[in-house]
Swiss-Prot record:
Keyword Plastid: no
Residue pairs linked by disulfide bridges in the UniProt entry: none
Binding site for L-aspartate: 171, 217, 448, 489
Name used for this protein in its record: Aspartate--tRNA ligase
Region feature (Aspartate): 195-198
Subunit annotation: Homodimer.
EC number: 6.1.1.12
Top-rank EC class of the record's enzyme: ligase
Chief location bin: cytoplasm
Protein task: Catalyzes the attachment of L-aspartate to tRNA(Asp) in a two-step reaction: L-aspartate is first activated by ATP to form Asp-AMP and then transferred to the acceptor end of tRNA(Asp).
A molecular function (GO) term: ATP binding
PROSITE patterns: AA_TRNA_LIGASE_II
Length: 590
């Protein structure tokens, strides 16, 4: 039906007869001439109808936005004065000789001239995806997956599919359950990741595996989360953590070079402890130049409990954040930042405004200066390298609250004051995470997952001091987003059972949930390691959007609903009966 795409026509096509198929993007009726912008997935081209082709001109008068049409015509060069430098096809136009209206369009529920609500865009997603910016994002996504496949094939990886209907295993979020009609009362689970299957593939001898795969997690959603999402899943045998990172870094550098024309360079490597200490985050945005500075040792003896308490508490921390030029902040802005850190558990926000350092106490403005002597203030200013015009904010509490609150404040202030260089790309690896973290109920939970190997520890050493264990794990972070994470896996049965025990999984439960894995570990398991990238998040970064729904063709809302198909929906009672399922309403509390 077509010979060319609208958006691919150039001066090299001048004089050629072409047939185009697409949609009316815009129509301008000048009486004796009618112009339309015609659009397909590759872009837009201007088509015009003149009186010499009367039948086509007459039919063109009926055109309206989003009519699906076919046009045959001749490509012509535009006059110099009519060239549109904002269009890729702006140097040419098509003189139409024939027009076919393939399908007409009703009045549109989306307005191309105004910003539509996200609810409307998701309800009429098939119309929203016609917009050039949305089409471009999905084309970029397709390019990314193509580049990934070629890279992985070239590096000896095998694309192997793993099951979608599997067994529920604890991986940190709730599973989506699928009832079995054949096995009454039993359920499959949709995979949160192919984690155990890819490890089993390594035990099967496949050495290098990858898969671009759908995963499912029934968890509370955020702006950058979806209940179903896509991973670039990777696993290797006989490779160390640095070797895995080297190959995966090469993949991401390849993507950025091919898609953005940007060489990311070598990725710096930072430990979890350093990232938390300097940036208050395990996924630091290195485009922001500000860092946290520990000042607890300077404040242990002050008669100000807000500072002295955490300064003398082994689990406490007092950190300072120097904001270049921050002395210009108003009291209202400072109060807003004080309220902001309370979201993260902080009780408030102390500060020192540095007006003129040379004037000593008279050169600063601070509500806490009365609790600190000149010597301590000068020591703080020295340590933070404060200059005239700077602001110093303080966080004082337990280590987690200080890291969370001051890390978030660092990002917010950096964005608000234009200190974060948003023209840059700042990738890094974060390594050496704690293996376990407090579950809030007196126990431990795996920071990554229970199949991650500890670093330089025997099973006996791990059992004796799990709180000291460092995971042989690594996350890739770009511009403050965790785009991928992985680890060296446990390949020894005793170590795996030790980890399960630390996590409170008794031997009976281990056999019930992971018997197949524990059995497989008995038969010459190779050392193996891997990683998974979030394809949606990678595409988000490479297309310049901050909304993950912009890079998924048919996404869910933050309530895990599809507004277009109205999923989820109530099931047919007959289907439920076949599955031996009965929906029971919860009793309402009076």
């Amino acid at each position: 039906m077509r010979t060319e795409y609208c958006g691919q026509l150039r001066l090299s096509h001048v004089g050629q007869q072409v047939t185009l198929c697409g949609w009316v993007n815009r129509r301008r009726d000048l009486g004796s001439l009618i112009f339309i912008d015609m659009r397909d997935r590759e872009g837009i081209v201007q088509v015009f109808f003149d009186p010499d082709r009367a039948d086509a001109l007459k039919l063109a008068s009926e055109l309206r936005n989003e009519f699906c049409i076919q046009v045959t015509g001749t490509v012509r060069a535009r006059d110099e004065k009519n060239i549109n430098r904002d269009m890729a096809t702006g140097e040419i136009e098509v003189l139409a000789s024939s027009l076919t209206i393939i399908n007409r369009a009703d009045v549109l529920p989306l307005d191309s001239n105004h910003v539509n609500t996200e609810e409307a865009r998701l309800k009429y997603r098939y119309l929203d995806l016609r917009r050039p910016e949305m089409a471009q994002r999905l084309k970029t996504r397709a390019k990314i997956t193509s580049l990934v496949r070629r890279f992985m094939d070239d590096h000896g990886f095998l694309d192997i599919e793993t099951p979608m209907l599997t067994k529920a295993t604890p991986e940190g979020a709730r599973d989506y359950l699928v009832p079995s009609r054949v096995h009454k009362g039993k359920f499959y689970a949709l995979p949160q990741s192919p984690q155990l299957f890819k490890q089993l593939l390594m035990m099967s001898g496949f050495d290098r595996y990858y898969q671009i795969v759908k995963c499912f997690r029934d968890e509370d959603l955020r702006a950058d989360r979806q209940p179903e999402f896509t991973q670039i899943d990777v696993e290797t045998s006989f490779m160390t953590a640095p070797q895995v990172r080297e190959v995966m870094e090469a993949l991401v550098r390849h993507l950025w070079l091919e898609v953005k024309g940007v060489d990311l360079g070598d990725f710096p490597v930072m430990t979890f402890a350093e990232a938390e200490r300097r940036y208050g985050s395990d996924k630091p945005d290195l485009r922001n130049p500000m860092e946290l500075t520990d000042v607890a040792d300077l404040l242990k003896s002050v008669e100000f409990a807000v500072f002295a308490g955490p300064a003398n508490d082994p689990k406490g921390r007092v950190a300072a954040l120097r904001v270049p030029g921050g002395a210009s902040l108003t009291r209202k802005q400072i109060d807003e930042y004080g309220n902001f850190v309370k979201i993260y558990g902080a009780k408030g926000l102390a500060y020192i405004k540095v007006n003129e350092r040379a004037k000593g106490l008279e050169g600063i403005n601070s509500p806490v200066a009365k609790f600190l002597n000149a010597e301590i203030i000068e020591a703080i200013l020295d340590r933070t390298a404060a200059q005239d015009g700077d602001m110093i904010f303080f966080g004082a509490d337990n280590k987690k609250i200080v890291a969370d609150a001051m890390g978030a404040l660092r990002l917010k202030v950096g964005k608000d004051l234009g200190l974060t260089d948003e023209s840059k790309w700042a990738p890094l690896w974060v390594i050496d995470f704690p293996m376990f973290e407090d579950d809030g109920e007196g126990g431990l939970t795996a920071m990554h997952h229970p199949f991650t190997s500890p670093k330089d520890m025997t099973a006996a050493e791990l059992k004796a001091a799990p709180e000291n264990a460092v995971a042989n794990a690594y996350d890739m972070v770009i511009n403050g987003y965790e785009v991928g994470g992985g680890s060296v896996r446990i390949h020894n049965g005793d170590m795996q059972q030790t980890v399960f025990g630390i996590l409170g999984i008794n031997e009976e439960e281990q056999r019930e949930k992971f018997g197949f894995l524990l059995d497989a570990l008995k038969y010459g398991t190779p050392p193996h390691a891997g990683l998974a990238f979030g394809l949606d998040r990678l595409t988000m970064l490479l297309t310049g959007t901050d909304n993950i729904r912009d890079v998924i063709a048919f996404p869910k809302t933050t309530a895990a609903a599809c507004l277009m198909t109205e999923a989820p929906s109530f099931a047919n009672p007959t289907a439920l009966a076949e599955l031996s399922i009965q929906v029971v309403k919860k009793a309402e509390n009076n």
